[in-house]
Every structure is written in structure tokens, then in C-alpha cells.
């Protein structure tokens, strides 16, 4: 409804020569100077409140320089970068953590199947940002959590040892506690469950997502 109702706002601002980006009722106006920004803010307020009879949230409406970063739709847009807002990354990791509890008792494949839609949705939305480092860190952390789940599902070290032998491991077996979070980053766990193994299980790999792309339907 907001998109339809605010079409008139979009058109009038464009006719006045302003470059805007809007999603629902979140609006970003791009200007070349502070004076131009003040003018655009005044005109936008006049259209929204005077013509469309809407209220403008003065606490959220402000002018800032791109060097300081502009927060918009979960990303922070700067002169030289666009990054995911830290609070969005924290919330995303909290969801992943909730879905990868070691006491869940679900088969690892079921956990991965449940994770993939969330991973796809998040990465597709935020691939506009320069997020390759953040995606790589999350992918590594998530694989460790999944290794921890599988270790607990195996329960006994003998099952891990058998799995390792079946997959070509010929070294000695160091002591490993199957329920320890630290064990999930051990050499034995990494050998038993390499990154390629998770690819075979179909885990969506955030490291493969191309980031830092901007697609605009507004540009002419």
C-alpha cells in the first residue's frame, strides 16, 4: 500500500530534479551539497505532510555526509564502501545459533536443509554490500557449529575414528571430547568433516556469494 500511495511523492521529487531511493516508507535522497540536502528535505516534507497528509518522523529524518556513512535498509552506505550494519549481522548469527544447538537431536542433513533458506535469503538481500569478509567469517563459524553437532551425534570417539579410517586417515588418534565446542575446531574434526563435505551435503556456502554489486532501476 505504501508503494502505491507514495508513487505520487516519487514522481514529484523526480520532476523537481531530486535523485531518490525508496523502499516502502524508507526514503533516501541523494544530494551534492548540504544546501541542496536542506532544500530537498524541506520539499520532501512539504509533499509528504502538506499534500499526502503523512507524518514525517523528525527523529529518523536527518542529513549526513557519505563519508560518515548512511544507514538504509540494514546496510551502511559510505563513499568507498557499503557494509552490513553490525546489528543485522548479530541478529543473523543469533538465528543461526538458535538453529544449530547441539542438543537439538536432529540429523545433520535436516539441520542443513533448515538452514539453507535462511542463508539464501540473507545473502541475496545483503550481497549488495561489500560483505565478502563477513560472509566468510559466518561460513567458517557455521561449519564449526555443524561439526560440533555431528561430533555429539556420533557420541563415541570410536565412531569418529571409524569414519576417519574409512576416509583415508592414517595418523594417530589424539584424545577428543565429543561434546566439547573446542573439539569442533580440532584437526581430527576438520579432517573428518572438511569444507568440501558440507558442499556435498548441500550446505549453502556464503563464501561463494559475489558481493558488492549495486543494481538500480532508477539510473538513466
List each model region and its residues.
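Non-catalytic terminal/accessory segments
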Residues: 1-220
Amino acid at each position: 500500500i505504501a508503494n502505491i500511495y507514495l508513487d505520487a511523492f516519487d514522481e514529484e521529487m523526480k520532476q523537481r530534479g531530486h535523485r531518490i531511493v525508496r523502499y516502502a516508507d524508507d526514503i533516501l535522497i541523494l544530494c551534492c551539497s548540504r544546501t541542496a540536502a536542506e532544500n530537498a528535505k524541506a520539499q520532501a516534507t512539504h509533499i509528504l505532510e502538506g499534500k499526502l497528509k503523512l507524518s514525517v518522523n523528525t527523529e529518523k529524518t536527518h542529513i549526513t555526509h557519505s563519508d560518515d556513512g548512511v544507514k538504509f535498509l540494514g546496510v551502511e552506505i559510505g563513499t568507498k564502501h557499503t557494509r552490513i550494519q553490525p546489528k543485522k549481522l548479530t541478529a543473523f548469527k543469533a538465528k543461526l545459533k538458535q538453529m544449530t544447538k547441539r542438543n537439538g537431536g536432529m540429523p545433520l542433513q535436516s539441520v542443513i536443509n533448515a538452514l539453507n533458506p535462511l542463508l539464501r535469503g540473507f545473502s541475496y538481500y545483503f550481497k549488495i554490500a561489500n560483505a565478502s569478509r563477513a560472509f566468510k567469517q559466518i561460513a567458517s563459524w557455521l561449519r564449526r557449529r555443524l561439526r560440533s553437532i555431528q561430533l555429539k551425534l556420533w557420541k563415541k570417539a570410536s565412531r569418529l575414528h571409524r569414519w576417519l579410517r574409512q576416509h583415508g586417515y592414517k595418523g594417530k588418534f589424539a584424545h577428543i571430547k565429543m561434546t566439547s565446542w573446542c573439539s569442533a575446531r580440532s584437526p581430527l574434526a576438520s579432517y573428518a568433516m572438511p569444507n568440501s563435505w558440507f558442499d556435498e551435503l548441500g550446505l549453502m556456502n556464503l563464501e561463494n556469494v559475489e558481493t558488492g554489486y549495486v543494481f538500480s532501476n532508477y539510473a538513466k
